[in-house]
Each structure stands twice: as structure tokens, then as C-alpha cells.
A protein has these predicted regions:
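PLP-dependent class I/II
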Residues: 1, 25, 29-34, 49, ...
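Active-site PLP attachment segment
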Residues: 1-28, 34-45
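Short loop/turn segments at secondary-structure transitions that flank enzyme active sites
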Residues: 17-19, 52, 175, 301
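Non-catalytic terminal extensions of PLP-dependent enzymes
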Residues: 58-316
Length: 316
């Protein structure tokens, strides 16, 4: 991320159809939303960021990637950290059929750093090497608890993204070796405290810890497939494509006469589905983490989606 003020942004236009297809509409929209008296501190910071990318961008990004690789190496090679933490590799997150390059990890203890350019050139999906996904379920804590109670409240480390059993560390061009060293030091402290607690734990407490770890790492709720849009919100063009009109469904939800409320805690929705009713979502349902919608307006609610929602132990 260039060192521009956060309120600033750039629109990158590099498309062969831009000039002939949308240039006039783009400028019309731009002039509608822009100000004739912009904040020149923001404008200046954007210009400095552009200059930085042009003159020293490659070097800064290279150091950023090296910092992320050094973090992976430090965690994977530390005997105590390996007991409770695991850096997720490419093979852990991308199925083999989508990795034509055959690369399983950007770094491993035997071969060191792998050439990630092959993955970027050949694979259908590739991971951002500057972001490190750390599995923390081995500590017995879910990602959100580990983020808030351990990293933020106790050690002052700010992160944004979590899942049921992972946290995501995002490096940037300002990441220093000392910040990486501090993070590793914190993880070692956490592992040492866990070791001490387990040494003093009773057999019953140990079993409870093992159950929590097993629940977080192995009993993951199956992610449901997208069901379908209700026929009332499908395109009637005869193409048979699965698209739906979310806008129509969203605003129809404001008509109370068209809506019915069901509790998630009981089996009333399953009973309605078994009786032949099609239940349709009126809004976006976005549990965080992970932060993506599992229901959108106009989508038919399936039993698999209901089971997934009940299995989630999220805060938002």
C-alpha cells in the first residue's frame, strides 16, 4: 500500500475498451461526484505515493515479501510454536487441481523459498505471499478470541481478519524486522503460557483442552453451496441462467405483508420446508468471521444453510 492518506484513492484505467466504450460516461460520473475544492493534503499524499511506486516500489515490495517469508520461517522452524500454531501453506488452502505449477508452499524448511512466479503464471488460484494465515486452533481459542483477548488487549497487536480457527497477518511496505521479531516473541510467550497451564492442569482440564482443539480444528461446519434464487426473482429471458434480481427482492422486504419471521433456534423452518414451503431470504446474512454472505435477498433457504448457521459460533 503506498504511503498516501487513507482517505485518498486512485482509479486505475487500463482497458482497451475504455476510450471507445465508457470514457464519456466515466468522466460524467467523475465530475458528478468529485469536488471543485478538493483537499490538497490528500492530493499531495497521492502524488507522493505515485512517486514512491515509480522510484522505489520494487525494492519496497521485495522487502515486504521477504518480511512475510521470514515470519513463515520463524514460526515453522520454532519447536515450541509448532506445537500450537501452523502457518497454512498453499496446499492447505488451494486444491491440487487448481495448482498446475505443483507448488505446495512458498517456503519450507528443506528447500527454503520457492519461486512463486510459477504459481502466479500457471495456477488458477494463488496466495498473496505478503499475507500470512496462521492456524491458532491448537491453542484452544477461536480466531476472534485470539485476536481480541490475546493479540490486541494483551500485547497491542492490531489485525483485521480472522476465521473460526485462523488469524491473518498482513505485511506492508512499512513492516520492519523489529515488528516481525515482536510478533514472534508474543507467539512464543503465548505458547510458553499454554505449556505452563497444561503442565499444571488436571486430567479433566487436559481433556477439556483437547476437546476444544479437536472441535476447532476438525469439526468444521460444511460450507453450504448456493441454493438458488426463487423463481419470482429469476430472469424470464429463457436462457436458464441462475442469476436473480436481488434489488427487487431487497425492496420487497420493506412490505411487511410480504414477510414472515421465523426463529433460528427451533425447527420451525425445517418443518416448513418439509411441508413443501419455499422460504426466501429478505436480506443479506453475513456472519463474521468469515465475512461473506451465506444468504442474499431472493435466495431460497435450504436445510444445509440452516445447519451451517447454527454451527457457527461467531460474534457478529
Amino acid at each position: 500500500t503506498p504511503t498516501a492518506l487513507r482517505q485518498g484513492s486512485m482509479i486505475h484505467v487500463h482497458d482497451q475498451d475504455f476510450k471507445g466504450e465508457v470514457e464519456d460516461a466515466f468522466h460524467e460520473a467523475y465530475m458528478t461526484h468529485t469536488s471543485t475544492s478538493p483537499n490538497y493534503q490528500i492530493i499531495a499524499s497521492l502524488d507522493i505515493g505515485r512517486r514512491q511506486v515509480e522510484l522505489e516500489g520494487f525494492e519496497l515490495v521485495q522487502k515486504q515479501v521477504e518480511s512475510a517469508m521470514a515470519m513463515r520461517k520463524a514460526i515453522d522452524s520454532h519447536p515450541l510454536l509448532k506445537k500450537y500454531f501452523k502457518v497454512l501453506k498453499v496446499s492447505d488452502m488451494i486444491p491440487k487441481k487448481h495448482r498446475q505449477s505443483g507448488i505446495e508452499s512458498y517456503w519450507d524448511p528443506e528447500h527454503g523459498w520457492n519461486d512463486i512466479w510459477d504459481a502466479w503464471a500457471e495456477d488458477e488460484f494463488a496466495l498473496d505471499a505478503t499475507r500470512v494465515t496462521l492456524a491458532v486452533g491448537g491453542t484452544g481459542l477461536d480466531g476472534d478470541t485470539f485476536k481480541n483477548q490475546i493479540l490486541m488487549d494483551k500485547y497491542g497487536i492490531q489485525i483485521n481478519k480472522t476465521s473460526r480457527n485462523t488469524v491473518l497477518f498482513m505485511t506492508n511496505i512499512g513492516t520492519t524486522r523489529s515488528s516481525i521479531a515482536y510478533l514472534i516473541e508474543v507467539l512464543v510467550r503465548v505458547a510458553q503460557e499454554l505449556d505452563g497451564d497444561l503442565d499444571e492442569a488436571s486430567p479433566m482440564e487436559r481433556k477439556g483442552f483437547e476437546r476444544r482443539v479437536h472441535h476447532l480444528m476438525n469439526e468444521l461446519p460444511p460450507l453450504p453451496d448456493f441454493s438458488r434464487f426463487h423463481d419470482a426473482f429469476r430472469c424470464a429471458d429463457g436462457t436458464g441462467t441462475p442469476e436473480g434480481d436481488i434489488r427487487q427482492a431487497f425492496f420487497l422486504a420493506y412490505d411487511e405483508a410480504q414477510c414472515e419471521y421465523f426463529p433460528l433456534e427451533d425447527d420451525s423452518m425445517e418443518e416448513a420446508i418439509d411441508a413443501g414451503r419455499e422460504l426466501v431470504s429478505t436480506s443479506f446474512i453475513i456472519p463474521y468471521p468469515p465475512g461473506f454472505p451465506i444468504l442474499v435477498p431472493g435466495q431460497v433457504i435450504s436445510k444445509e444453510i440452516l445447519h451451517f448457521m447454527r454451527a457457527l459460533d461467531v460474534k457478529e
